[in-house]
Amino acid sequence: MPNSVTPRPMSSRRQWLVAIGLVAITVVLAALRYSPWRLVWNITPSEPRGLYLVHVTGPVPVSHLPYGALVQFHYSCPLIPARVTRGPLAGITRLTCLDRHVAPYPDGTPFVKRVEGKPGDILTTRRGCVTIRRRDGTVRALGCALRRAPDGRPVPYHMHWNDTRIPRGQFYAGSTRVPQSYDSRYFGLVRRQQIIGTVQPVWTTAKRY
C-alpha cells in the first residue's frame, strides 16, 4: 500500500502574501468598475489581438477624434431592402437587418475600429472599392467590399457612396489591416451617439502595419 503524503500547511508568510494579492486584485477590479477605464481583450483580426484600455467618454465631438484613432462604439445593424419570398407577403420588399447575411452581431455589440473618415471628407465607391478624399486633399483607399464572407456565404449588400460628404456628427469606421474587416463598407457611417470611448493598446501580439 503506497505511503500517504500529508500536504504541508501553508506558512503564515505565504498566507499573508496570498491574502494581500487577493485584496489587491479586489481593489483593482472595484476601481475599474467605477472608473472611466475598461480593459477589453480583442480577438478579431481587424486590430492585433491583445489587451486594450478603453477610456469611457461617451459621445464626443467627432472633430476631436484624430485620423487613425481607435474608437469603441455600439454597433447598429443597418437595414437593407429585401424581397419577401414566402408567405402572404411574398413579393413585397421590406427592410431587413444586414447582419443576417454578413455577420450575426446584435445591436449594441461593442466594436473597435479606427477613424478613417471625418465630417467634410468625401466618400466614393467604384466597383465595390471605397476611396476617401479628405479635407486636406489627400486621397486614401479604404478597401473593397467582399463578394463572399470569410465562411463562404455570399455578401449581397454593401454601402455605395457617390461622392458623398460625411455629415456632421458621423465618421467612417474602418480597418485597412485585413481585407475581411467588417466595417463601414457594410454597416455605414457611425454616429457620435454610438461612441463608447477611445482605445489604447496595452499589450498585443503584433504590430499594426
Model-identified regions with their sequence ranges:
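Solvent-exposed loop/turn segments at secondary-structure junctions
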Residues: 78-79, 123, 130, 178-180
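Protein maturation boundaries and topogenic segments
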Residues: 1-110, 185-209
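Mid-length scaffold segments of soluble, non-membrane domains
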Residues: 105-141
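Short, flexible surface segments
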Residues: 66-70, 119, 167-168
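Acidic/glycine-rich C-terminal interaction modules and beta/coil loop segments
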Residues: 149-199, 203-207
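Short hydrophobic-aromatic micro-motifs
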Residues: 52-54, 72-73, 124-125, 167, ...
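Short amphipathic beta-strand/extended segments with alternating polar/hydrophobic composition
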Residues: 137-151
